Amino acid sequence: MSTKSILAMALATFAISTPVLADDHGGPVTPKPYTTGATLTKAVQASITPDKALEILKAGNARFAADKPLKRNLKGRVQATALGQFPFASVVGCIDSRAAPEVVFDQSVGDIFAARVAGNTINEDILGSLEYASKVAGSSLVVVLGHTGCGAIKGACDDVQMGNLTSLLAKFKPAVAAASTPGEHNSHNHAFVNEVTELNVKQVVQRIREQSPILKGLEDEGKIKIVGAIYNTSNGKVSWY
C-alpha cells in the first residue's frame, strides 16, 4: 500500500473519531450554552464563538494563577470523551515542562487541541493539524503560546548550533533580527530575550495567516480567531496579543 493511501486512511479514521458539527441525521446542531468545567459536546461546542473561547481560556488562566483550579472527575471525562471529542480551541505551545496549555489554562480531557514544539513555531505538520482542528473538528480559536525564559529563544539569541536544533533555532532569527532592545543582543539581556519572545509569537501568528489559506479564510469569515499569548513562568499569568 502506498504512503498516500495509508495517510488517506489515517485521516479518514481521525475524522470519524471527531464528528463535524451536524446532528445524528446530518442536520445542523442546535447550540447549547457552555457550562464552566462541563465535558464538551457537539451542541456545546457549536455555541462557543471565538470570543467566548478566548474568554474561557482567560478565566481558566485566572483560576490557575490564583491556585484555584476546578475539581474534575477525570475518569468520568475519559469515559465521556471515549467516542468523540469537541475541543473549543487549539494551542501551539512550546515543549517547556512549565508551560503545558491544559494546565496553565485549567482545561481538561477533551477541551483543547495542543501542538507543542520548542519555541512554539510552525511547520506544515502543525499547520495541517490546526486546519484539521478548526475546519473539520470545529475549534473556534487558535492560540500561539510563548513563555518567558524560553530556552529555544535564548538559543537563537546566542546563535547556538547543535545537530537538528540548528535548523529549528533558525526559525527564530527573524524575531532576533527585528528586536531593538538596547544593550547586548544575547541571552544575558533579559529584556532583549523578552522582546524576541514577543516578536516571535506575533510573527508566528502572522505566518499562520500567510501560510494557511484555510485558517485565514475561516478568520476572515469570523468563524475563528488567531491570537498570540505569552505565559509568565514566574507568576503563572498569561498576557495576550
Where are these regions (language model features)?
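Gram-negative bacterial Sec-dependent N-terminal signal peptides
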Residues: 1-22
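Divalent-metal-activated hydrolytic enzyme cores
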Residues: 22-84, 110, 119-137, 154-241
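Short glycine-enriched loops at secondary-structure junctions
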Residues: 93-98, 118-121, 147
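Acidic/His-rich structured neighborhood in mature extracellular/periplasmic domains
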Residues: 97-100, 109
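Short helix-loop-beta junction
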Residues: 105-114
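Conserved functional hotspot residues or short segments at active or partner-binding sites
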Residues: 144
